[in-house]
Curated annotation (Swiss-Prot):
Protein name: Aspartate--tRNA(Asp/Asn) ligase
Gene coding for it: aspS
Function: Aspartyl-tRNA synthetase with relaxed tRNA specificity since it is able to aspartylate not only its cognate tRNA(Asp) but also tRNA(Asn). Reaction proceeds in two steps: L-aspartate is first activated by ATP to form Asp-AMP and then transferred to the acceptor end of tRNA(Asp/Asn).
Region annotation (Aspartate) ranges: 197-200
Site, Important for tRNA non-discrimination: residue positions: H30, G81
Signal in keyword set: no
Amino acid sequence: MRTHYCSAVNELSLDKQITVCGWVHNRRDHGGVIFLDIRDRSGLLQVVYEPENKEIFAIAEKLRSEFVVRVTGIVRKRPEGMINDKMETGRVEVIGIQLEILNQSPTPPFLPDDHQIINEDLRYKYRYIDLRRAVMQKKLTLRHKLNSCIRNYLNEQNFLDIETPMLTKATPEGARDYLVPSRVHPGQFYALPQSPQLFKQLLMMSGFDKYYQIVRCFRDEDLRADRQPEFTQLDIEMAFINEEDILQLIEGLLKVVFKEILNITLPDKLPRMSYKEAMTRYGSDKPDLRNPLELIDIADLVKDCDFNVFASAANDNSGRVVALKLPNGCDLSRKDLDNYGQFVTIYGAKGLAYIKVNDLSAGMAGLQSPILKFLSETAVQSILNRVEAQTGDVIFFGADKAHVVNESMGALRNKLGHDRNLINPGWQLLWVIDWPMFELDPQSNKLQPMHHPFTSPQELSAEALRSKPTQTLAKAYDIVINGYEIGGGSIRIHQPELQKTVFDLIGIDEQEAHEKFGFLLDALQYGAPPHGGIALGIDRLAMLLTDSTSIRDVIAFPKTQTASCPLTSAPSPAGNAQLTELGIRLAPTITTK
């Protein structure tokens, strides 16, 4: 039906007859001549229809935006003064000799023009029009290139692409499962997988020592800008390896991806930082290293001060007191400071103390703060020295339980970095390693795994794990790019007794363990090799590589913030006949059509 994509028509095609198919992007009448911009996924091509061919010209006069056409013509150079170097085909045009309308279109709710600002709900309702925009075509094309690059790299590394089940058993992995009722087993349900975690471990025990899969996963949890109920991840597992093997594999993969897609050369070895250091310096386990601001501990300087907010946190074993210096921040107004104070309360902080350094050489007289009356001159001077304050700086303080300080001041650090244009351009990739094996749930005061219950501790003794579980580190690692957690993984437990110990520590007794994970515990007894892996979020990685603000921009048909699809009206009620066949009766407050 066609001989060329639009963008393939160039000066090498001069004087040749070509045929293209696409949409009418624009139609202009100039002096009795009709100019068409024809669009396909490769780009735009200008076609000219002159009035001498009356039959074809009459068809061209009927064309409107988004009509689908087939155009045949002769390629020629554009006249001087009409060359458009902003277009890939801007030095040529096609003199139309044939024209066929393949389909018509009413006036669309919006035109696929990148210059228009379109309401997001409208974009998703008419996603098939939205996806015609050049920016969306480029983003999804880049995503395709990303997936192809990944497959090529892993295939060359002798990995096998193996599919795992979509209908599986519900397991507690930290989020709610999507359940699928079974018609042939009334009253029983499958779960859509949150990840192929257990199946890929079973593949290692089956002798497939290098597995990967670009796989859809499902989590029924609250949405954010970087979350979707269904998402795509690159899933990798390897046997007979250690942490270093995984890190080197991913460093090699990312180096190839960045070079092929962005023409950026990454270092052979990425920087590494312990979880403890990341939380101490940045208040986050996924720090954006492009931001120069850091948290500085000052608890030792304020233990004996008269400001109870500082002193109580400084003397609390689970407390923390930090300073965050904003260079040249004295221009912040009282309203600005109040807004930042309100901002940190979102993360559990009770307020935000600050000191403005108007004139460092003037001593206490050169400082401005409501808390100065509670602090001795010695304590203030020690704080100024610790943060290396300069005239014009403002110093913010966080004092509370450590987890509150980390979350609130880490978020403030990020906000200040963006508000004050402190984020350096470029790319900062980082491994966060040496994660705690467990954390204490603040509500139940029970241990819960930081990653998942199949992660191996660095200390492989079950006795040592039981004696100091909160001090035990895991063989776990996350890859962070520009402040986004792009992937995480670990070395897995391959000894059944150690796996049972971990289950016991997190409150899963032997009976529950066998009910939920009996197949895994059985498999571990039959010669399970040492193994480990990682999963990378394809959506997030594509979002960063395309400089998008949301993963919804790199997913063809995403869900909204309310986990709904305006295009298809999903989710929707099920009919009574279907519910009856599945053996389901809805609660009285829920109605069906």
